[in-house]
């Protein structure tokens, strides 16, 4: 549900933390095909014709009009929903996966509103009685349902009914780490979208904080002692916690800063590159929130923190994968630049004829959270989902006819010239960065 940029309480209307967005007409985005669809598993079950279909099959060819596509997709979705209560665990898992792929690619609020109670009951049984992968898929579907239903009464009711189960699985040390990971993500996203009570927000923050805080012990080596099997869980819990910080009242932010800012740097020594990056981004977000509360905010252990960030920004250890080293250096250079100077690098996301500008760590965390759950469907939802457009300040959904779209589309030659110029500028910028990388030391 939309929240104010600087607000100290959850409320209806307005805009979320992260500032307003700018949108402009641009060339075709060239969005990639849904990578997640290639991972859809075919499952032997009582309804093989339903579960073997990918999302692209549901969407139909160009010869079929939009109405027929919608009806065809809804018929298949009805079959998926029916299979959620099947006796076979494989059938239920296949139905959950197919449902997840379909809902990430299309917007179907009316269809889901009519079946919200049925879906809630089915997901509750999957979370209660399912094991491992089934629980993980159920939590993933719940996250997408919250995005589809939005902050309205049905979305709030769905999240409230399943929130205790998500917390139960997340807090169960004997549960599958994969299931706990997806429950953490669903808890954070569901609370961000559908929770209306500050107490719900505080309880979710406390639960997520409890998951990763134990790895920030009193000793500096605590993070390195975490089993590799739990790295994904800690990363998901930390990211979900950071997402909820973007809508947390200022009075609570002050206590969280005092409690967590001295402890989070310990996670920078983790063996997991994803956990190190999640910790670095969370630290940058905490600094951003602290400076929002107090413009001349000063962190006591600034020198040691910047030293750790600088080490990761220039890391060249050969035992780490080359791709991981490159990604880590890029992100930690941005984190160090912000912590030291307070300037956040701006990112642009092009979708359709519009552009989304990400100019703060809060907006970065919010966008990444939705992108993680929607995959390449994020572009479709940015164009058509009123919830996301409200969150990022994109305004009403653009309605353009075929003639308008054709008029806006540039020629292949013009696109080639634009890409060539962009490539040249990017090469020059990277060359300068490589030449001066030693200056960080």
From Swiss-Prot:
GO terms for molecular function: ribosome binding; translation repressor activity. Associates with ribosomes; promoting ribosome inactivation. Residues 1-15 have a biased composition (Basic residues). GO terms for biological process: adipose tissue development; fat cell differentiation; negative regulation of translation; regulation of translation; Wnt signaling pathway. This is Interferon-related developmental regulator 2. The lineage of its organism: Eukaryota, Metazoa, Chordata, Craniata, Vertebrata. Residues 1-51 are annotated as: Disordered. Pfam families: IFRD, IFRD_C. Ribosome-binding protein that acts as an inhibitor of mRNA translation by promoting ribosome inactivation. Associates with the P- and E-sites of the ribosome and inserts a C-terminal helix into the mRNA exit channel to preclude translation. It comes from Mus musculus. Belongs to the IFRD family. Keywords: Translation regulation.
